[in-house]
Amino acid sequence: MIRPQDCEILQWRSFDDEAAFFASMGRFFASARVRRECGGYPLSDGPYHRWFVLRRQGDTRILGFVSLEQHPDVVRLRDAYLRAEARGRGLFRTLRERVLGHVDQLGLACTTRAPQACARLLGPHGFAVHSTRGSWVTLMRKAHGTDKDTDGASRGAVRRTTRVAACRAD
């Protein structure tokens, strides 16, 4: 059984070591299954991308990842994937918390595009529907500790709530 405490999360950038990056991540870029699960679009990488990669400690086999694209004023969550055998074990929760913690440390707003059904899963983590196009939504998460709506609250993870965010149709 794979448990979160048996795993490590690494931060990778292809520009640091392109050969090593694609030797490990290439199978995900080439996989039709990963493409289908990531909305039908191929994975992309670029100079502003950072990959949070989850694997068992001492093992090189990647169990999952979240990619983000950091710009001076916003972070875009791009792609997320977890192998089927690693699902339902709290691993994605651990990965998501690490990524959002990183975004909070940067003090930047965060945006992502996702299928409409996923909006309710991201609502408890500070994301709100910004716009809708077909079955996809753009979600925004304000920068923590820097926005006037936070009343000067300190930077940190968004507290989990039991309320589900409502989806707007703009």
Walk through the language-model features, giving the residues of each.
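Short amphipathic alpha-helix that is part of the acyltransferase structural core
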Residues: 1-38
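Active-site rim helix/loop that mediates acceptor-substrate recognition in acyltransferases
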Residues: 26-58
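Conserved beta-strand in the GNAT
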Residues: 53, 60-69, 74-81
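Active-site acidic-Proline motif in GNAT/NAT acetyltransferases
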Residues: 83-85
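Conserved acetyl-CoA-binding loop-helix of GNAT-fold acetyltransferases
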Residues: 88-101
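Conserved GNAT acetyl-CoA-binding A-motif
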Residues: 103-115
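Conserved active-site alpha-helix within GNAT-family acetyltransferase domains
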Residues: 115-134
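C-terminal "cap" of GNAT-fold acetyltransferases
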Residues: 131-170
